[in-house]
């Protein structure tokens, strides 16, 4: 099932030199976001840089949100991860998509124009309504915290 999402091209190179974000295979969950920068840039170890993707989206449907997630190869091979770990795009946001790149490695990393930096994934949203209670019904886990599940 495909859901239409409005996209605005902010960088004219998208659609001509670089493709719009798209699913690589029928089973892909995410679409690659690219670095739409003017020139190559270096990210020093420990440094974080905010990189434009050249697009804006408007999800519009309050039952959906978008998340920006890291690409596994960049983190594993080069230490490049998202500076905010995950980017959450609310359904009513209409501004440019940016990727926060953090170099947690020990060498500078060069980002080239058009490099694939992150993935955009759409997820369902459930808005909760809190119900105040004095006690919870008993559960198997109870109040066991970090590292508690699956232990005897």
From Swiss-Prot:
GO terms for molecular function: dUTP diphosphatase activity; magnesium ion binding. Substrate binds at residues 71-73, 84, 88-90, 98. Pathway: Pyrimidine metabolism; dUMP biosynthesis; dUMP from dCTP (dUTP route): step 2/2. InterPro entries: dUTPase, dUTPase-like, dUTPase-like_sf, dUTPase_trimeric. It catalyses: dUTP + H2O = dUMP + diphosphate + H(+). Its EC number is 3.6.1.23. Its cofactor is Mg(2+). It holds the Pfam family dUTPase. Keywords: Hydrolase, Magnesium, Metal-binding, Nucleotide metabolism. It comes from the Bacteria. One of its GO terms (biological process) is dUMP biosynthetic process. This enzyme is involved in nucleotide metabolism: it produces dUMP, the immediate precursor of thymidine nucleotides and it decreases the intracellular concentration of dUTP so that uracil cannot be incorporated into DNA. PANTHER family: DEOXYURIDINE 5'-TRIPHOSPHATE NUCLEOTIDOHYDROLASE. Belongs to the dUTPase family. This is Deoxyuridine 5'-triphosphate nucleotidohydrolase.
């Amino acid at each position: 099932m495909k859901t239409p999402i409005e996209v605005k091209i902010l960088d004219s190179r998208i659609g001509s030199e670089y493709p719009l974000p798209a699913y690589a295979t029928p089973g892909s969950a995410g679409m690659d976001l690219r670095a739409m920068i003017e020139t190559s840039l270096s990210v020093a170890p420990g440094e974080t840089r905010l990189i434009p993707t050249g697009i804006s989206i408007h999800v519009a449907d309050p039952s959906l949100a978008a998340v920006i997630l890291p690409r596994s190869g960049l983190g594993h091979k080069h230490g490049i991860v998202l500076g905010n770990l995950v980017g959450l795009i609310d359904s009513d946001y209409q501004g440019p998509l940016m990727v926060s790149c953090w170099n947690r490695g020990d060498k500078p990393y060069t980002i080239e124009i058009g490099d694939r930096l992150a993935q955009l994934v759409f997820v369902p949203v459930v808005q909760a309504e809190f119900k105040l209670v004095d006690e919870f019904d008993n559960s198997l886990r109870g109040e066991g915290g970090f590292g508690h599940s699956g232990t005897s």
